[in-house]
Structure formats: structure tokens, C-alpha cells
Amino acid sequence: MAKNKKQNGKAKTPPVVAAAAGEQKETIGNGHAEQNGLNGHASSEESDPAAAGPNESADDKSAGVAGGGETEQQQQQQEDDVMRLMQETGFTVQVLSPGVEPLSIQVSSMELVQEIHQLLMDREDTCHRTCFSLQLDGRTLDNFAELKNIDGLQEGSVIRVVEEPYTMREARIHVRHVRDLLKSLDPADAYNGVDCSSLTFLHTITMGDIMEKKKTRQESVDCTPPDFIMPGARERPLLPLQPGTGKKGTPQPLKVLTTSAWNPPPGPRKLHGDLMYLYVVTMEDKRLHISACSRGFYVNQSTDDAFNPQPANPSYLSHSLIDLLSQISATFRRCFAQMQKKRTQRHPFERVATPYQVYTWTAPALEHTIDAIRAEDTFSSKLGYEEHIPGQTRDWNEELQTTRELPRATLPERLLRERAIFKVHSDFVTAATRGAMAVIDGNVMPINPGEDAKTQMFIWNNIFFSLGFDVRDHYKELGGDAAAFVAPRNDLHGVRVYSAVDVEGLYTLGTVVIDYRGYRVTAQSIIPGILEREQDQSVVYGSIDFGKTVLSHPKYLELLNAAGKHLKILPHSVYNDKEEAIELCSSVECKGIIGNDGRHYILDLLRTFPPDVNFLALPAEEEAVGKESRAMGFPIEHRHKLCCLRQELLEAFVENRYLMFMKHAAVQLQQCVKMKQEQKAAAAQKTEEGGKQAAIEAAAPAEGDKTPAKDAKDGKEAGKDANDGKEEGSTTKEAAAAAAAARSVPKPDSEDAKKLVESLISSDQKNESMEVVKRACEAVGSLKEYEFNIRFNPDVYSPGIRHVDEEPNAAGSLRRQKQLVKDAAEFLVKHQIPSFVHECLDHTSAPMDGVTLTELLHNRGINVRYLGKVVDQLAKIKQLEYLHTIAVSELIVRAAKHLFTAYLQQTDVMSMAAAISHFLNCFLTVSTGGYQPVANGTGADGDGQLADEFGPKAGGKKQNKQSKRGGGGGGGKGAAGGGRKATFSVPSSDNCEWTALTSKTLWAQIRQELKAYWDFELTVEQPAKEGKESKAAVIDSIEPLIGAFKLQKISLLRSFCLKTGVQILLQEYAFEQRNRPAFTDADIVNVFPVVKHINPRASDAYNFYTTGQTKIQQGYLQDGYGLISEALNLLNNVYGAMHPENAQCLRMLARLSYIMGDPQEALAIQQRAVLMSERVNGVDHPYTISEYGHLALYCFANSQITTALKLLYRARYLATIVCGENHPDIALMDSNISLILHAVGEYELSLRFLEHALALNIRYYGEKSLKVAVSYHLVARTQSCMGDFRSALVNEKETYAIYKQQLGENHEKTQESSECLRHLTQQAVVLQKKMNYANGKLLSTGLPPIHIQPPSMGSVLDMLNAINGIIFVQISSKEIANFKNEIEKRQKEAGAQSQQPGGGPVQANQEEVDQMLMETMQKTAAGIPFEEQDGEKKDGAAEAASHTAGGAAANTAAPAVSPRRKS
């Protein structure tokens, strides 16, 4: 970030231009939906060099590295910083603990003493100690000191572990630690969503650590897939989602460990050193009371009814509770040792806490055990000692702001600062989530208890909580409760971008938005002093009454202007109620408050970005939307007026306008020069107009009719020209053409751009060039006359705001400002949506579920409220049928979520489980009557009986009638929630409207919601009967939609649970049963909060990562690997071991290791990536599924065939749960599975998967695509191995036909296929002869066996690599020969001794070879290289050159890096 600032400061061009895209790298990726580059999933290396966006060249991706001399120096400086940091590396020290062998550990000088402390608490032999100090030469080391600052600490130093006396706090920490050790193997915390633990099943699937497995031989492979994995399987079982849950875990070491009821120690015992008492029941049923004193733990003589604190006989005093329990109970000793062994065998990534809590939507039935510490955790009184810092609670605001103030000049400082920001932020999110749940559960006292429940506010643990309702009619003008519900989310977007811009001296509040049990809670840190005075006294900037009284403040203007340059916010003036003009640089409702700590805070950032006119009802004279938008049915009046455009859209729009500006100016300047040369004064005017015309036409495909329409009315030449030159139509072809055109023009802040503008201004024809710039500015709607300046006024359409507009015809007039906001909205509809659809056609980053789809839309700046329009576009394209299904499911689930929110608010807490199960029944099955309680035979259903005893008397006829009258209408308003109850903690117990809900009423509401919110008509055509027209089917349940949109109930259930926080019981659900509901109240296990927050970034790591990506795109794999490894080190430094970005980085490193010829290293790294993705993204997240696929490939390359198949089966199973079988990724998985099955001789199974993959490839890529050719070839290959040469010939002919058509007759692939056809024909002839011979002569003995050579593992691996898009570098034999000659020639020139041919690749200068490889890679034919060759592969480039039999293309490893090993 700092680097980018320096860079932008040097710009000589207008400052806005300089800021236009440089900061984009920093700000864009901070959202909740993680962005491109490091955060996104399809990294550029895997998709396409231009993945950074249509206009971003590979050089720009390197975060300014290729910018110019000074930037390169900065980059070098930064790399030197890192190297220096990494060189301060390790040395070894000895640690001596009492009663344990001395331990040697490698430490880094940057580490804190506390990290050694933590290491000892994790190790098997020392984990039972918590209360100890570390001493060096008799001096106690400070826990928070860095090792490099400790005198006398060096290589070989001996650190002693010294047991310290306990205090009350230390004793409690020790007991908690012991309890954590005893339940460390218990997955209950992960299911219950506590303590940042989450699930992982990788080692259950692979049966242990992959790296420790032996290679499997072909004969010993068990590879039959379960039935539900097979293509075309109907059922989607839920139990395999969490394998191994039914197995019995480790034996229990203790029955009970809890604090004793004799606590606290009475006065006399305190004076004897007693700190607390514990109660233990051992497995042998001994009941013991234990005293904790300052010297340790001992058994006392108390019983359940008599207090006797004297030590028992025989007395043991142990410093560690574990030692004492091992003395008392032999079972404990044995079981604890077993547990420890198991615990330390687990991969560290299975144990480390995640930064944010990940919840799981299914859980098995868990046994509820006695646990006093858990009980104590639920009460907020324990806040004091849970935070291991002095004082009762943490001052969150002070911590959050102090970390931002840390210095950031050097790399080590920035790392320290970012680590501190991240740590405090993740702690704050955890605390805020707990607090919000406590508020809704009714466990926190409001600060205004006398008021109505909706208007109550809360403070807990120094965090302020408010509810998402329109209190005191604050949002009355903007949409009431609907606006109040959306405002916190918009405010969070504002906090996100201002934190990302990171202007020194400008502070935002810690903000978390939590949706829990139907309520939206906003948690914020508290500005010092704000509670001591009224709001209108504290606000020094902005307005508290939506623009009636407006204040400004010079310091705020300065700070917000600095941020506004990056965020494209325009400084503007408005009138207050005294008719004074007040200058602002934000929306009116953004408030500035100077806290008691002297810091400048901004809050209420709900309108940071300009409004979206496509969803505003504006007065008719405004002509709000363009032609294109009107054709699509806009404007749609939304239920609130807080619809804003996304930051990503504004970035794209500005970049697009800048392109137009540069083309316009360049064309006109050429015209000027030409005119001067020809000295034809008379024709000058015409030439200029012609040039102008040409420029507009050049920009038209990218831009369309976005020139200000009003200019034309004013009769301005430029406006006329612009409108004449516009082209209609928003076809995807145009979008593609625009993207192509865009690549040739420099970016707004690139060096070329600056030079171009400078040359315009400083050229000889000063006046002409000024005129050129002026016209270009006018054509693109710039707000300055002689400068490219596109910024947005967020208040242009705010009701009740009066703008100062002194010069209505000036460049920066209000009319121009409004036009820009309209143009941006039009740009979204006309350009972004079509180009999104067009981009989806190549299926490179095919989303699998609503979450990944939303992420893709957000990256393009498309809000989810446009999803209805996106669905309409997708419906027209057959190849995107799968995406249409995903988008429709997302719409339906979101509509259901809106209704569910209101539904839960009307539900009494005691009926919560019953109400949720009833809603799911109405949503996913056909439920005709209202709620029917189901008596479960199991004893577990106590709550079901409770609900019947006290809850809604659904059986009573009278009541049912009443509720039927009231039901159905309540949820119609969705998030705005019609008819909400006045209280939220416990609604009155006769509140049972929910029981009247039926499938029919729910689906009527869902359709209503889809129309109102997304303008989407949910209709299904009934097939026409003879002689009758087809008519729309009645949608009164989900059933008609399943076939029409190819929806899948299990996918809808998963999506709904993840969005609403509902956790259901892990079991099979019978959706089709008519006589019994699919869900009962016993199936609803829990409701979790859904948490939204910002994601602080590791900016230096991000820059290293993007630079690494650029190197890889340029072909410098080794350099790229180094940079990305460095990025991973920095990420670990900032985020700790667990984070989605770390997983991203690991995946990239694994792929690079593999491409560079080290499959074993790739396997080790990818295993970590899978574990991490399961832990931080979720076990069934699409990212995790793709990680499984990569791991399977690397397993196969390491000859772990069984494991590879298990992993692919897992990936395929998860994908079918998430999105069903109709998806491009399934085609790839099926091809992979079939190839491996083919390798182990399971030809029939292999063929089933292959045929399915072929069908999908034809559907998505068209019948004549190269992918389909490969599929046909694979089918033919398998059929030939089965002896079915006739079918094989038919399929191989298809391959040949495609290659001939696409690549030409002389292409290597076509000739290979032709060779294959000849081979198959021969085989078929031989077979026929054998059969004739057998029929004639040897009827009695039957057919002789057909000898078919099975494929070698090497050729299968090559094929796997090819279909997974891993190209080692495909070089034809001829090219290899040339390549060798070229290297030899260069070496001879350099006077080096050349190697003998055939001795493997010739050594050459790394850079030269990389350069040549890059050239050959660029020559790679149309993308799908493969080798069809059943002999063993030869190794190395030189041998491949000589190996031309059958004309096969050799997939050689990039020779300079290292040749691929033989498999």
C-alpha cells in the first residue's frame, strides 16, 4: 500500500488520473466475498494471462513492478527488506524440562519467548504444564520479548523450564488446559461452532497422512466406486458428507472433571494457600475432591456432604493435575497416553484454530456430557479471566485504532502492524458474535430498558449492539424497516473501503453485522466519550437529519478528500437550512465525530457509493435510465432507497471511460499533426470532425450510448458527434471486442498514459492540443474541462438535499454529475452483464453454487439484485444451462431466506425447532395442511413433547381457523418483515401464525418476493396436450420446478441452511414421502449466526503474490516459485497458519512444484492446501472440491492409485451434493476417474465415466470442440482395450473429423488420430480373422484370448496432465531439435563445452532457456495437448526429440527447470 502511494505521488498527470487504477489493487480485494488475485480462486496462472481484467496487461498485474525505473528500485528495495527479514533466521537452543529428555528446537530471532512457551504446551511430553517460566542462566525471560533482544541467547544456549507457584488465575487456566487436552480429539466443538474449531475429513478418506503411505502396486488396487458416485445415480445420500462419524472414538479417561460445589475456599483455607476445589469421578468410579493450592494439586478428604480440606492418605502433591490423576487412576493413565499419541499424530492443520468460526450445516446426534467449564463459559461473568490481559474487559476501540497507528515505513514494521490489525480484528469478530447471540438470547441488559424491544440498544464487553429496525422513523423516507435492515450491510461496505484506503488520521469503527434467529444485529466499537453527550453535540461534520442541518470541518474535508481520490468520490457543496453552502466530500449522512481521544472518526457510511438509478423511482423529468436499461425493464422501484453501485463497477467504468478518452485524444492529435503538415487551413475543421467521428466509433463497442444525452440537446458539436457515433446492441460479441480493444491502451495510471497526456499538453500546437483534450474530456463526461476527472457525487439523487449548482453548463455541473451516475448504471446493464455471460461461456471459472456465483458477479461490480436479469440472459444460452440452474436456485433460496427472517421473528422460542422444520417441509416437500406435530418413537424427542405441552395447540380447530386467516400475509414483505412482533427475546406463547403455513402459501409468497425484489417471474410451462396450447403450471410446491429448472432438493437444502445458519441432523431425508413430513423438530440441531465483517489484508504478501504470478505468466517458473513462497511466509507472518489466502498460495506452490518436475513436493504441499481449505472454507465448499481434484492428480503421479481414486470419488460426491451432475467440472472429474480406472484395467467402469464426460463436454463446448475430440479419443481407447474395435473405430473417426476441421489435415494431432485409426482398423481385421478361424476350426475350444497391451502409467499420467490443463510445454520433435541446436549454438558462441546428445537436456543459461520455452509455449497448438502412446515414455527433452515413432507430440517437462521423472 505504502509503495503504491509513493508511486502515485510522482504522477505529473492530473492526480485523479494517477489514482484511477493504482489503488484498485489495494481497495478492491477487501470485501467479504473474496476477490481476484490472491483472494479469488481461479488464479491467473490457471486461467489466462489477462485474467486480471480485460484492460489489465500482465505487466500491470505485478503491482507496479514494471512501471519504470523508480518503481523497479522500490520493488528491489522491498525484496531486499524481505531477504533481510528472512535472513534473521534460526538457531538451535536446548530446552530442559523436569523429568523429560532435553529437547533441541530451532527458533528464529524474530520469535517471541511466548512461542517457545506455546510449543511446550503443545508437545506430547510437556503439554501437561502451563504454569512455568523459562530461564536462561538463572534469569527469567519476559514472555513478550523477541529472542533477538535477549542478552546471551545464542546457538546452543540452554533454556530451563522452572515450575512457578500457582495463582487463582493460573490454576483456572491449568484446569481449562487439562480439560481441553481431554477433549482435544472430540469433534463436538467443531459441530457446535465454538473456539474456532472446524471439521476436516481428508485423513479419514485417505486413512492417514498421505506422505507416510507406501506406493500401491497395480494389482492391489480396490477401486469400485460406491453406487451413488456412478454417473446417473439418482440418490444423493447425506451421510457420506461426514465420513467416520459413527465410529467409536478413543476410550474416555475420566467420567467427570468439574469445579466442586465447595468453592470458593473459606477464609481460613485461603490462608493455607487453597485456591479452588475440583470434583473428579474416575472410570473406576472413585469420587474424589481435589484441592488446588499454590504448590499444585492434591486429593483432600471432603465428600459430597462433608467438607474436610485435609490431604487424603496417602497424599500426593503434584504440580500438574495430569500427574495427580495418573497416580490416582490406572485407566486415566492408560487412556491419556493413548489420547496423547493420537493427538500428536494428527496433522497440525487439523488442530490449529481458524481465524474466524466456520459453521457446519449438518451434525450427527452428539452426546451431551457434564462439563462445568463449558457451563461457566456460557455466562458472561467469566469475561474477566478469559482475556489474558489485565482489566475486566478489552477496550476494543483503543486496540483497533492503536494497531492502525503503528509505523509502516519498512517491511518488518508493516508485517508487525498488519499482524496486530488482523489479530485484534479476528478477536473482535469473535467477541461481537458472542455478544450478538447473547443479545438475541436475552442474556444482556439493554441500556434503554424502558423502551420498546425493537428500539433497545445494548453494551456488552465494550461493544455497542443495535437491531436492524427503523427506530424513531429514522429511515421513514428511505423505506422504513427494509432500509434499516440493509443499512448496516451498506455501512460495512463503507468501512471496508475506507479501511482499505487507510488514510492516516481517518478512523472507522470496528463493525460486524450478525444475522441470528431472524434478527440483524450491528456490533460496533465505541467512540470514547460518545455516550456522555447527545449525538447532535458530538457531530462536527455531516448531517444527523438527512440534510436539514449540515456541518463541515476543515480537517475532515482534508482527510475525506484524500480518501475520495481513491474511492472516486466527488467533493460537492449543499445548502443547509440557513441557505449556507456547505462543502462535503462524502454523502450527507456520513458523520464526523472527534472522540475524547482526539481521533477523527467517521460513521454511518451507508451511502459511500453513488445510488443505482436502475432501482430508484425518480421523477419523470429526470429521465433516469438509458434506452438499454429501459428495454430490460428498468427502473424497478426497490423496497428501499439505499441501492448503491459497487466499488468494482466504478473502477471498471472509470477505466472504460479512460480508454475512450485516450483513443479520442490520440485520434484527434494525429489529425492535428496531419493537418499541420498538409497546411490545408480550409479543410482543418472538417478533418477534426472526421477524426472526432472516428474516435467515437473506435470507442463505441466498448462504450455504447453513454455520452451525455443532454449535451446533444444543447447543440454541442461533441455531443452530437458522440451520439451519432454510438452503436446499439449489447451482444456478447461486442463485449468481447471491447475487451480486445482495451488491451492496447495504457491504464489510467501507467507510465505510457502519463507520457501520452504530457505530450498532448506540451506539444508544439499548444492551442490545438488543449482543444483536443477539452473535446476528449467532454466526450467522456469528465467533470473538468481540461483534465480527465471522473468522480461520483453520492448525494445527486438523495431526497431533500439541495445542491449548489452555480454554473449549470460548466463541466462540473450537477447535470453532468447526474449523467455520470446514470451512465455508470447503464454501463452495468449494457456492458458488465453481457461480458459476464460471455466470460462464462469458456467455463474456466465455472461457479458451483450461489456463493461462488455471487463472488463472480461482485468481482464484475454486478449487485445480486440484478440476478433476475442475469438469469434471463442465461436462459437464452443452451451451453450455460448449468449456470442457469445455479442462478435460479440462488434466487429461490434468497427469496425463501427473506421470508424465513420474518417468519422466525414471529415464532416463540419454545417452538423454534418445530417452526424451522415446518418451514423446511413447506419449502422442500409438498405440505398441504398446517403444522402437524410428529411423535417420534425415540426418547430423545423431549422438546417435541414440550412443544406439544406448552406450545401452539395446532390440534385445536378454533385456533387453527384464526391462524389460517392471519397466515400467509405476514411474510410477504420479506426482509422488511410485515407484522413483526414487538418483542424479540420471547414472543408471547400464543404466537403461532407459523403453524398455518402450507407449501401453497409459502410458494405464493416466494413468487411474490422474486417479482418484487428481482423482477423475476417464476413460471413453468406445462407440456401441451393434444390440440391444446401449453399453459403455465400452477406452482404451489417445489415439485413443478425440479424438472423445469433441473433443481436438486439437497442442493437447495444445503444452500438454505448455509444462508440462514440452520444446522440439521446428519441423516437421510425422505423428501418424497407423502404420509410423513421429511423434517421433524428433532432434526433441527442448532441455529448459528451468519457473520459479515471486513477482511484486513496482508498487502506486502499480496504484492509478492501478484509479482510471482506475472513471472509465471512470462515463463520464469523458478522465480515465480520463489516469490510465491515468499508471499506464503509473509501470509503466515500476518494471518498465522490458517487462512483462505494461505490455502490459495499453497495450491499455487503445489502446482508449480508439479510442473517443475517434483510431484512428491507437490503432493506434500497440496495435502496442506486441502486440509486448510476444509478448515477455513468448509468441507463441502467448491474451493475444497477443486483442491481434492488437484491432490488426486498428484497422488496418481506418486503411484498412490487407490488414494487418488478415493479423493476423486470424494470430490465427485461433494460436487453432486453442491450442484448435481450437470456441470463442466463434473466432466473433468469423470475424465480423471475414467483414466485412472483405465490404468488399473477396470475398462467397463472407466467407459461409464467417460461416456458421461463426453456427453457433458458436447453439451458445454459444442460438438466440434477440441475437448470433445479428446473425449471421443479416450472412449475409443477404452473400447479398443475391451476388444470392441468396431465402436472404437466409430469414436476415433469423430476425433479425426474434429481435428481435421479445427486444426487442418497436416497438424500433428490430426496425423496422430489418423495413425490411431489405421492401428484400430488393423486390430479389428486381426480380431475378425481370429474369430473366423475359431468359428471354422476350433469350435470346441472357444475363442483364443485377445492380446491387448494395457496402457503404461506414464501415458495415463500424460493424458491426466493434459486434460487438467497442465502443460509441461508441448514441443514437437522438430522444435526440440531446433531448440537443442539453438542452445548448442549459443553455448559454442560462449565457448562452453557442449554435452553429448542423448545425455538429457543441455545446460544453458536459465534466462535464455526460459525465454525460449516461453516462445515455444506461445506456439502451443489450440490448447489440448495429449499423447496417445501405449509404450513407456522416454525421459528428457533430448530423448523425446529422437522418439518420433507414431508422430506423437512429446509432453516434456520444461527442460531448464528439471525434466519430469518417469512414473
From Swiss-Prot:
<feature type="region of interest" description="Disordered">
    <location>
        <begin position="684"/>
        <end position="753"/>
    </location>
</feature>
<feature type="compositionally biased region" description="Low complexity">
    <location>
        <begin position="692"/>
        <end position="702"/>
    </location>
</feature>
<dbReference type="Pfam" id="PF13374">
    <property type="entry name" value="TPR_10"/>
</dbReference>
<feature type="compositionally biased region" description="Low complexity">
    <location>
        <begin position="10"/>
        <end position="22"/>
    </location>
</feature>
<dbReference type="GO" id="GO:0005737">
    <property type="term" value="C:cytoplasm"/>
</dbReference>
<dbReference type="InterPro" id="IPR027523">
    <property type="entry name" value="CLU_prot"/>
</dbReference>
<dbReference type="InterPro" id="IPR011990">
    <property type="entry name" value="TPR-like_helical_dom_sf"/>
</dbReference>
<feature type="region of interest" description="Disordered">
    <location>
        <begin position="1387"/>
        <end position="1463"/>
    </location>
</feature>
<protein>
    <recommendedName>
        <fullName>Clustered mitochondria protein homolog</fullName>
    </recommendedName>
</protein>
<dbReference type="InterPro" id="IPR033646">
    <property type="entry name" value="CLU-central"/>
</dbReference>
<feature type="compositionally biased region" description="Gly residues">
    <location>
        <begin position="965"/>
        <end position="980"/>
    </location>
</feature>
<dbReference type="Pfam" id="PF15044">
    <property type="entry name" value="CLU_N"/>
</dbReference>
<comment type="function">
    <text>mRNA-binding protein involved in proper cytoplasmic distribution of mitochondria.</text>
</comment>
<dbReference type="InterPro" id="IPR023231">
    <property type="entry name" value="GSKIP_dom_sf"/>
</dbReference>
<feature type="region of interest" description="Disordered">
    <location>
        <begin position="942"/>
        <end position="988"/>
    </location>
</feature>
<dbReference type="GO" id="GO:0003729">
    <property type="term" value="F:mRNA binding"/>
</dbReference>
<comment type="similarity">
    <text>Belongs to the CLU family.</text>
</comment>
<feature type="domain" description="Clu">
    <location>
        <begin position="374"/>
        <end position="616"/>
    </location>
</feature>
<dbReference type="GO" id="GO:0048312">
    <property type="term" value="P:intracellular distribution of mitochondria"/>
</dbReference>
<dbReference type="Pfam" id="PF12807">
    <property type="entry name" value="eIF3_p135"/>
</dbReference>
<dbReference type="Pfam" id="PF13236">
    <property type="entry name" value="CLU"/>
</dbReference>
<keyword id="KW-0963">Cytoplasm</keyword>
<feature type="compositionally biased region" description="Basic and acidic residues">
    <location>
        <begin position="703"/>
        <end position="731"/>
    </location>
</feature>
<dbReference type="Pfam" id="PF13424">
    <property type="entry name" value="TPR_12"/>
</dbReference>
<dbReference type="GO" id="GO:0007005">
    <property type="term" value="P:mitochondrion organization"/>
</dbReference>
<dbReference type="InterPro" id="IPR028275">
    <property type="entry name" value="CLU_N"/>
</dbReference>
<feature type="compositionally biased region" description="Low complexity">
    <location>
        <begin position="1438"/>
        <end position="1456"/>
    </location>
</feature>
<dbReference type="InterPro" id="IPR025697">
    <property type="entry name" value="CLU_dom"/>
</dbReference>
<feature type="region of interest" description="Disordered">
    <location>
        <begin position="1"/>
        <end position="79"/>
    </location>
</feature>
<feature type="compositionally biased region" description="Basic residues">
    <location>
        <begin position="955"/>
        <end position="964"/>
    </location>
</feature>
